[in-house]
A protein has these predicted regions:
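Short beta-strand/loop motif that positions the catalytic acidic residue
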Residues: 77-79, 84-86, 90
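Conserved serine/cysteine hydrolase catalytic core
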Residues: 70-79, 96
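Catalytic histidine neighborhood in serine/cysteine hydrolases
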Residues: 102-120
Length: 148
């Protein structure tokens, strides 16, 4: 949920020293993520009452609404550059989620799909491609960054 949280935060006012956003395997919304997991993991069809129950539980136990866990608005108003990573074999968050975030993003952006990588394994699967993508991003948007 880290990548999606960062993407959601990008729609808010952030400190001046935040030069860009890096999102590895982020989903668009908690609703879309739940629907994907219900279908792919448990072979359940779309059942609105399940979403409603989960939303109620989120409000009671975690004090937030599932509607709040959505990157759509942030991607429309964010002005900071975003580097999206996603593994082509991610079985937890479908790669289409990063593609949708990329398409909605109005800021400078780049999408890197790492072939064969599973969830959060992009750097492990193709380190050189991952590392070079990061270097190019930092060089372009944060020239003062020190990268070892």
């Amino acid at each position: 949920m880290g990548a999606s949280a960062v993407l959601m935060a990008s729609g808010k006012e952030l400190p001046h020293y935040v030069k860009g956003i890096i999102a590895d395997c982020g989903f668009v919304s908690m609703k879309s993520q739940f629907q994907y997991m219900a279908a792919s993991w448990f072979h359940l069809p779309h059942i609105p009452v399940l979403l409603w129950r989960l939303s109620v539980r989120c409000r009671i136990q975690a004090h937030f609404s599932m509607k709040d866990a959505d990157t759509t608005h942030a991607m429309a108003v964010n002005h900071r550059p975003v580097l999206f990573f996603h593994g082509s074999r991610d079985g937890f968050v479908h790669p289409d989620q990063s593609v949708k975030n990329y398409q909605m993003c109005r800021a400078p952006k780049r999408l890197v799909i790492i072939g064969g990588a599973r969830h959060l394994c992009c750097a492990f699967q193709q380190w050189e491609k991952y590392h070079q993508s990061l270097l190019r991003f930092f060089e372009k948007y944060d020239a003062g960054a020190r990268i070892g």
